[in-house]
């Protein structure tokens, strides 16, 4: 099992009260699985993805990755965990407007000691996989929404992560581009990467290997939706 969550709790304290984002979440995710996390806005989907990616800590429970407990208190190990294992995609693409497609995709390689030729080889290889090798010198504003999301996917995959987290990756796209992105994620899974995507769309969730529903910070079985 790639991931095991046991009794995960996450809350935020405001001046007036405590906001519970996740309330005792148990979840297992297998290697090479395409899993959808469904739910309405504010239900805890994004928080769950951030925990899986080591971007935010937990208040209680345990997160095990490949059988080893993720230590949220050790910032150095946590950063290493993210760098080695995790790719992240968000709905609004989060591309840097001043950088070309090449520059955006190359960003995750800045922490690695690679020759210019090797970096170029890796960037062109991943852009070829997402069908954007002819857009390499374009800027984000020159691309369609679907193309921008493909750039974001390429950037997330450039360091070959074992875990790809996608937060509403098709939410702002038309039906044709939704299909393109979903098929792309399925190909990623075929290559051995585990993909967890957050969505509010039952049709998107139905295309995944399985899905789980979050309501009021708790995981519900599909038959209980």
Residue ranges of predicted features:
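The feature captures the beta-strand-to-loop junction immediately N-terminal to the Walker
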Residues: 38-40
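Conserved ABC ATPase signature
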Residues: 139-149
């Amino acid at each position: 099992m790639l991931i095991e969550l046991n009794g995960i709790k996450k809350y935020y304290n405001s001046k007036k009260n405590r906001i519970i984002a996740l309330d005792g979440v148990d979840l297992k995710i297998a290697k090479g699985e395409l899993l959808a996390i469904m739910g309405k806005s504010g239900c805890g989907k994004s928080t769950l993805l951030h925990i899986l990616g080591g971007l935010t800590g937990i208040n209680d429970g345990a997160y095990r990755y490949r059988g080893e407990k993720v230590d949220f208190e050790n910032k150095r190990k946590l950063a290493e965990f993210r760098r080695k294992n995790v790719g992240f995609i968000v709905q609004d693409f989060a591309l840097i407007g001043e950088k070309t497609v090449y520059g955006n995709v190359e960003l995750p390689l800045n922490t690695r000691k690679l020759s210019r030729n090797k970096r170029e080889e890796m960037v062109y290889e991943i852009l070829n996989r997402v069908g954007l090798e002819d857009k390499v010198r374009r800027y984000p504003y020159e691309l369609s929404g679907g193309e921008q999301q493909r750039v974001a996917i390429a950037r997330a995959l450039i360091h070959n992560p074992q875990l790809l987290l996608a937060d509403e990756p098709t939410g702002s796209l038309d039906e044709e581009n939704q299909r393109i992105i979903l098929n792309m994620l399925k190909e990623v899974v075929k290559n051995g990467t585990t993909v967890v995507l957050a969505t509010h769309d039952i049709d998107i969730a139905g295309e995944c290997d399985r899905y789980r529903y979050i309501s009021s910070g708790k995981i519900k079985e599909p038959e209980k939706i």
